[in-house]
C-alpha cells in the first residue's frame, strides 16, 4: 500500500527552549501527521552533537541528544522548578538554533533535574544503567573525561587514557563518579521522554523513520571504546578516512574525515559491533534509513594525510554477506537504502539482492551536470522506492527553483507543469505523491512554502547548517 510522510528534524520543531524537543511540540506534530493522513515521520539522527552541530557526527551511536529533553515535561514530574529554566534566554532568533547558547546554559539546568532524579528515583535509574551498560559505561566516562579536558578530542588525552589502560580507567571512574552519574542520568531522562513519544506515535498510527549514518565520528565514544573495529595504527590514529571522489558537484571530492571500518576484523567477529548498533536502533525506530548504502559494496578510502579526496581509492566493502547477517538478527525489518551519488552496476545489484527500497530525489531529475538525471524523473520510478522532492542535503523546492540554472528550472517547469496558481512547491510535491513510488516523503519546509531560508544543510560547508526552526503557529 502506497503511503506518505514528512521529513522534519526534532531540532526544527518550535519550542520556547531554543530548539525542538521531545515535548509538547513533538506531540502536536504527531497530531498534525495523523490528522493529515500521513503514515511516516522521518527524522535526522538524534545523537549528541559536538563541534559543527552535525547530527551525522555524534559523540555516540547510542546516546540521545541532551538538547532534545523537554524542560516543561521535567517540571511536570517534579524534576525542575519553573523558575529554574523559564526566565533564561534560550535563543536570539526563534527561526534558528543557537547551539553555542544551548551549550552554555542547558547543562546547568539538566544538572538540577538529574540531581533530583538520583535522589528520588535511584532504583529505576540504576536499572536503566544496568540494562544499557554495553554502551552507557563507555559513553558516560567519555563525556566526563571530555569535560575534564576542556572539550578536547580523545586523541589529545593522556596516552594511558587514549589506550584505555586498566589502571588509568579505574582511577578515572573513581575520580569522576559524580560526572559519570550526571551523564547517565541525562540519558535516562532522554530515553524516558523518547519512549513516551514513541508510544504516542504508535497509538496514532505514525511510524518513525530513523537515520543511521554509515560512519561514526572519530571523536566519539564508539571509536574510543572499539578502536579495533576501525582502520587505525598502533598510536590510534586513523590510517585512512572516509569521503567521496571528485564529481560534477565537487572538483576535489569530499573529505569527510571519519575513520573507516576494519571490515576484515568485523567479518571475523561476525559483525558484532554493527549488529548490536542496528538492533539498538530498531528499539527507537520503526524503519531505518541507512546512509551511504553504496559504502557497503565499495567504499572510498583516502589516506589520512591527504589534503583532498583526490588521493583516495575504491576498496571492497562487506557486500551481501553483511546484510544477510543483519537479517538473521533483526529479521525482515524495513530498511531504506540511501543509494544516491556515484553508483556502479555492483551497487545496483546489491540493492536488488537486499530487496531494500532505494531513494529518488526529484531535484536531481533536472540537473544538467548529472547525465543520470532521468532516473530521478517520476515516470521512471520503480514501485519499490522512496520518493523525495529533496532531502536534508538539498535546498527546499522553492529554494531550488530560485538557485538552479535557468535551463534546469525550465525543464522542471515543462516536465512537471508547474505554475504560480498551484504553487511551484506544491507542483513538485504533487509529482512524487502521484508517482508509482511506494513511499513519498516531503520536507516540512516545502509544505510551509519556504525558500532557501529553510534549508537544513549545505554539504561541504561549515557554519549555518542544522539551524532551521519552524516558527510557532
Question: What is the role of each PLM region?
Answer:
Residues 9, 53-191, 216-441, 445-447, ...:
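Alpha-amylase-like alpha-glycosidases and glucanotransferases acting on alpha-linked glucans and related
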Residues 183-215:
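Conserved, well-ordered alpha-helix/loop/beta-strand core segments that scaffold catalytic motifs
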Residues 24-49, 280-285, 432-434:
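Catalytic domains of carbohydrate-active enzymes, especially glycoside hydrolases
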Residues 34, 194-204, 327, 351-352:
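Surface-exposed amphipathic alpha-helices with a cationic face
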Residues 1-11, 27:
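N-terminal regions that are enriched for targeting/export leaders
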Residues 44, 207-209, 213, 287, ...:
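Outer-envelope exported proteins of Gram-negative bacteria
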Amino acid at each position: 500500500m502506497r503511503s506518505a510522510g514528512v521529513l522534519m528534524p526534532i531540532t526544527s520543531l518550535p519550542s520556547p527552549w531554543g530548539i525542538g524537543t521531545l515535548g509538547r511540540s513533538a506531540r502536536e506534530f504527531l497530531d498534525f501527521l495523523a490528522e493529515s493522513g500521513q503514515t511516516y515521520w522521518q527524522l535526522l539522527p538524534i545523537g549528541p552533537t559536538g563541534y559543527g552541530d552535525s547530527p551525522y557526527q555524534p559523540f555516540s551511536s547510542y546516546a540521545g541528544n541532551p538538547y532534545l529533553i523537554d524542560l516543561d515535561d521535567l517540571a511536570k514530574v517534579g524534576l525542575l522548578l519553573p523558575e529554574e529554566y523559564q526566565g533564561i534566554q534560550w535563543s536570539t532568533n526563534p527561526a534558528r538554533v543557537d547551539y553555542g547558547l544551548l551549550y552554555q546554559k542547558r547543562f546547568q539546568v539538566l544538572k538540577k533535574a538529574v540531581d533530583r532524579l538520583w535522589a528520588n528515583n535511584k532504583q529505576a535509574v540504576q536499572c536503566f544503567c544496568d540494562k544499557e551498560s554495553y554502551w552507557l559505561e563507555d559513553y558516560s566516562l567519555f563525556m566526563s573525561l571530555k569535560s575534564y579536558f576542556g572539550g578536547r578530542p580523545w586523541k589529545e588525552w593522556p596516552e594511558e587514557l587514549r589506550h584505555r589502560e586498566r589502571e588509568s580507567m579505574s582511577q578515572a571512574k573513581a575520580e569522576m563518579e559524580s560526572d559519570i552519574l550526571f551523564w547517565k542520568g541525562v540519558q535516562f531522562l532522554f530515553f524516558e521522554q523518547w519512549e513516551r513519544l514513541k508510544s504516542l506515535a504508535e497509538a496514532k498510527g505514525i511510524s518513525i523513520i530513523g537515520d543511521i549514518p554509515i560512519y561514526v565520528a572519530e571523536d566519539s565514544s564508539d571509536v574510543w571504546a572499539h578502536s579495533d573495529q576501525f582502520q587505525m595504527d598502533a598510536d590510534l590514529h586513523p590510517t585512512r578516512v572516509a569521503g567521496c571522489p571528485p564529481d560534477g558537484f565537487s572538483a576535489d571530492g569530499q573529505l569527510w574525515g571519519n575513520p573507516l571500518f576494519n571490515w576484515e576484523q568485523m567479518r571475523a567477529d561476525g559483525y558484532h559491533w554493527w549488529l548490536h548498533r542496528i538492533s539498538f536502533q530498531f528499539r527507537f525506530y520503526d524503519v531505518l534509513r541507512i546512509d551511504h548504502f553504496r559504502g557497503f559494496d565499495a567504499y572510498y578510502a583516502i589516506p589520512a594525510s591527504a589534503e583532498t579526496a583526490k588521493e583516495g581509492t575504491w576498496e571492497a566493502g562487506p557486500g551481501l554477506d553483511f546484510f544477510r547477517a543483519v537479517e538473521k538478527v533483526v529479521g525482515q525489518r524495513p530498511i531504506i537504502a540511501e543509494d544516491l551519488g556515484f553508483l556502479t552496476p555492483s551497487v545496483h545489484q546489491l540493492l536488488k539482492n537486499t530487496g531494500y527500497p532505494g531513494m529518488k530525489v526529484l531535484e536531481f531529475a533536472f540537473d544538467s551536470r548529472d547525465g543520470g538525471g532521468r532516473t530521478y524523473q517520476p515516470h521512471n520510478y520503480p514501485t519499490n522506492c522512496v520518493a523525495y522532492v529533496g532531502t536534508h542535503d538539498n535546498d527546499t523546492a522553492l529554494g531550488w527553483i530560485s538557485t538552479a540554472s535557468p535551463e534546469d528550472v525550465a525543464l522542471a517547469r515543462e516536465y512537471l507543469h508547474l505554475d504560480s496558481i498551484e504553487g511551484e512547491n506544491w507542483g513538485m510535491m504533487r509529482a512524487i505523491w502521484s508517482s508509482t513510488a511506494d513511499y513519498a516523503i516531503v520536507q516540512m519546509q516545502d509544505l510551509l512554502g519556504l525558500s532557501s531560508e529553510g534549508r537544513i544543510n549545505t554539504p561541504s560547508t561549515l557554519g549555518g547548517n542544522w539551524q532551521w526552526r519552524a516558527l510557532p503557529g
